[in-house]
């Protein structure tokens, strides 16, 4: 059932692929000469067809210079150094991102801004407008789904840029220029959208479409981050996170997967843990799931997977993060299966011959090491690579792996974090160990397999700073590395601008917890204002 649902959705994504070819043109002719009433009359999957663009747009989140980059790069976990041959310098944009010295003209910001606003205006608001224009009433469930998905796009604008416009309608005057709203106002808007829509959504598992539980999960994340985004007066919102997590748990719709690797396998739609995912399929083409293969693997990696194309040798794990989070010299971490399931490391072998591989010089072993010689002259073999998602044997340029957005493991860990911060360390430890259990051999000593309440609540050094609940933060890293959460985690622990890691010296400037509004947008809209701390 789940498999069929995924494939049907993928075909719908493919049918609208041409509609998503441009993220900067916000006024495409989405349905050509097909009217809304004609679609509803002719299509058994009318609502799915109409809503396809707003889900299909999410496939751009993991493209190069997009959302994944702004949620994981610039943190203690991942980096793109300049290679010794000059590759990946790209005008210094990756080095500036790692050093927190970015400019409002850097392409990441305009790309992400365009992708998110395309999702809101062209993919969500236009659907609502077309129904209104046709004089048709959108059913309550479909309207709730559009509002929840629109809130999903707004969540990322709120997290990354903070102070942004609010646009609920598509039909605006030709020269309309939306006005910047304060972050708190945007937060209140997203909360309202989710609260008013979530209970009108279906309860059954839908994998690649929003249901009631996906909306509640998103709202729980919103409340969890509220204090770090808006101030200490929002600390009480953790109570709401706890309530929402308990509702998801109590629904009995999801459970932890017995296999951590299955969540990120080519058959991820079979995982009982996934609440919401974005499907990719190699037959539907661009955009590709860039960070899991092309962006991270070396260009000589084809024999490892008998692949049709190699990688770009860019994305690497930050060595200090690997050592601090998954220290291979510490048996407690080496026995953690997530260590080898999260990274591509060590000597690589030819899939067909099983023989060890060498780099292009034919002499240097193809052996990824947990060190980077220089941030501006990295060697070919420097750095562990992102290996969390299964790479298909015979991998093409297009990818066949689905992006896991929300999963039940995160629901549990959000609950545990709230309990820990509110003084119930033992309750938090019980949940943490429930999640950890699958990643350790049961024959190992309990002291290896489990974390204690004392460990989780103690002051612990992370990124050179002694912080409360530091071991819990490390555990978040072990469980969720590379899943687009690290920036928010570091901000909640006040480490994003205060922590130190390989090649990164802290700037200790609070305003850097928000990215700048892209300069191109400021030039085209006089009603936008730049975030505090940025001159342009």
Model regions: which residues?
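Flexible, polar/acidic helix-loop-strand segments at domain edges
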Residues: 94, 98, 327-407
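Membrane-proximal, proline-rich intrinsically disordered regions
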Residues: 23-74, 520-536
């Amino acid at each position: 059932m789940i498999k069929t649902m995924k494939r049907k959705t993928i075909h719908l994504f493919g049918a609208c692929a041409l509609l998503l070819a441009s993220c900067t043109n916000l006024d495409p002719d989405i349905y050509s000469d097909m009217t809304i009433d004609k679609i509803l009359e002719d299509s058994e999957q009318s609502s799915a067809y109409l809503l396809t663009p707003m889900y299909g747009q999410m496939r751009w989140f993991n493209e190069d210079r997009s959302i994944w980059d702004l949620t994981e790069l610039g943190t203690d976990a991942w980096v793109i150094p300049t290679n010794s041959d000059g590759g990946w310098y790209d005008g210094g944009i990756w080095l500036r991102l790692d050093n927190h010295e970015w400019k409002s003209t850097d392409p990441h910001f305009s790309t992400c801004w365009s992708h998110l606003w395309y999702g809101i205006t062209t993919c969500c608001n236009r659907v609502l407008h077309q129904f209104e224009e046709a004089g048709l009433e959108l059913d309550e469930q479909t309207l709730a789904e559009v509002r929840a998905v629109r809130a999903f796009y707004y969540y990322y604008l709120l997290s990354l840029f903070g102070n942004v416009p609010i646009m609920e309608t598509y039909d605006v005057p030709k020269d309309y220029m939306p006005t910047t709203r304060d972050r708190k106002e945007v937060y209140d808007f997203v909360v309202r959208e989710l609260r008013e829509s979530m209970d009108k959504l279906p309860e059954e598992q839908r994998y690649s479409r929003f249901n009631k539980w996906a909306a509640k999960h998103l709202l729980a994340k919103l409340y969890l981050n509220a204090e770090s985004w808006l101030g200490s007066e929002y600390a009480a919102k953790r109570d709401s996170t706890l309530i929402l997590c308990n509702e998801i748990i109590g629904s009995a719709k999801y459970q932890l997967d017995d296999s951590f690797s299955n969540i990120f396998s080519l058959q991820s739609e079979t995982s009982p843990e996934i609440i919401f995912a974005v499907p990719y399929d190699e037959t539907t083409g661009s955009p590709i799931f860039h960070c899991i293969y092309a962006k991270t693997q070396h260009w000589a990696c084809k024999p490892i997977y008998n692949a049709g194309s190699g990688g770009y040798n860019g994305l690497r794990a930050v060595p200090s993060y690997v050592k601090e989070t998954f220290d291979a010299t510490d048996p407690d971490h080496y026995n953690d299966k997530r260590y080898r399931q999260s990274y591509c490391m060590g000597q690589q072998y030819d899939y067909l011959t099983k023989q060890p591989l060498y780099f292009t010089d034919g002499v240097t072993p193809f052996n990824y090491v947990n060190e980077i010689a220089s941030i501006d002259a990295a060697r070919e073999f420097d750095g562990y690579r992102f290996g969390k998602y299964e790479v298909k044997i015979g991998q093409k340029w297009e990818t066949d792996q689905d992006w896991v957005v929300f999963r039940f493991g995160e629901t549990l860990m959000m609950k545990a974090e709230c309990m820990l911060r509110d003084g119930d360390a033992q309750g938090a430890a019980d949940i943490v160990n429930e999640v950890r259990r699958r990643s350790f051999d049961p024959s190992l000593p309990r002291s290896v397999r489990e974390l204690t309440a004392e460990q989780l609540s103690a002051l612990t050094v992370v990124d050179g700073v002694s912080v409360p609940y530091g071991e819990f933060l490390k555990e978040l890293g072990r469980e969720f590395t590379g899943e687009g959460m690290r920036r928010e985690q570091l901000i909640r622990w006040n480490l994003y601008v205060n922590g130190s890691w390989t090649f990164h010296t802290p700037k200790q400037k609070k305003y850097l917890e928000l990215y700048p509004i892209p300069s191109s947008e400021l030039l085209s809209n006089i009603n936008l204002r730049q975030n505090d701390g940025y001159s342009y």
